[in-house]
Amino acid sequence: MSDSERTSLPLVFDEPRGRKKPPRHLADLAPDERTAYAKELGLPGFRAKQLSTHYFSRLVDDPDQMTDLPAGQRAELVAGLLPGLMTPLRTMEADRGTTRKTLWRLFDGALVESVLMRYPDRATMCVSSQAGCGMACPFCATGQGGLQRNMSTAEIVEQVVAGARSLARGEVPGGPGRVSNVVFMGMGEPLANYKAVLGAVRRLTDPAPDGLGMSARGVTVSTVGLVPRMRQLADEGIPVTLALSLHAPDDELRNELVPINTRFSVAETVEAAWNYAKVTKRRVSIEYAMMRGINDQAWRADLLGDVLRGYGDWGWVHVNLIPLNPTPGSKWTASDPADEREFVRRLEAKAIPTTVRDTRGREIDGACGQLAATEA
């Protein structure tokens, strides 16, 4: 890899100071906090439960449909607990309408994207957790855009609720349905926005009507390897799936592809992933974007297998190979299919379960690593 191909962006862990915060929303709050907040606004506490039912269970966004609320108070209640957070600017479709990428403008003008993917047996929502990203991975369009700000818990949840509405209303081919899976693999490094992401996970998994009532097993949180946060997440008691974006099994290459590796080595990062599996009893997914001539050599497959096998073969890990998706100006390309097959063969020879990701939304820049949130 030449010097011109390497990232020159710094790692950024904290959002810029002084940014105005999004409006406070029901989804930012735990159930007991909602009741207290309603009372702060001079409203009866039980109204918070009614609004939670409309938002999370009925997926209502029209105050006129909230007929159990006094007509004279609806506007006040909605403005106080369900303020508008995001405006859809554009929705693009692929895969005969079953993949939908939405560009959102947040209250302060920041742009983010989410992707809804419907399959015959499930519907997955890929959500953003930050506007931009500070992890500076050179092959990722989001990382090359830098970090604008963290998203709030409610802004994250609203992406899922909006997708759930689209499915419930039959707007996606296949008839009415529901969101079964959520992956934090959109824009941003989820564990760099830890508090808001954890709050969103709790809202997604809280039983209805306090939340969406999803199974924690249907939620995947990705990370490039913020080791202290990986350890913290393991102790939260929420058995979500952890996906580690590894992309290289050796420090020399990973330092270039995933700059956080200069802070936390491959050994430290994989050990934290193993610890997550040990504590939660949930299998960890190792994400590995296949780049032609960069990280797809057979010897690297062997090394990856050895690194993972070093922590035992008790089913703690699974490798998910991702054909590299093109991004504007990128000098990297996807691996040759023959090299990809050999990579899989070598990992499986070391008893590492391995799959190649079904790439959805590539033609609408909605696939892994392509989200850049531009209005162009």
UniProtKB/Swiss-Prot annotation:
The keyword tRNA processing applies. One of its GO terms (molecular function) is tRNA binding. InterPro entries: Aldolase_TIM, Methyltransferase_A, RNA_MTrfase_RlmN, rRNA_lsu_MTrfase_RlmN/Cfr, rSAM. Binds 1 [4Fe-4S] cluster. The cluster is coordinated with 3 cysteines and an exchangeable S-adenosyl-L-methionine. Transmembrane segments: none annotated. GO terms for cellular component: cytoplasm. NCBIfam families: rRNA_mod_RlmN. Specifically methylates position 2 of adenine 2503 in 23S rRNA and position 2 of adenine 37 in tRNAs. Reaction proceeds by a ping-pong mechanism involving intermediate methylation of a conserved cysteine residue. Belongs to the radical SAM superfamily. RlmN family. This is Probable dual-specificity RNA methyltransferase RlmN. The gene is rlmN.
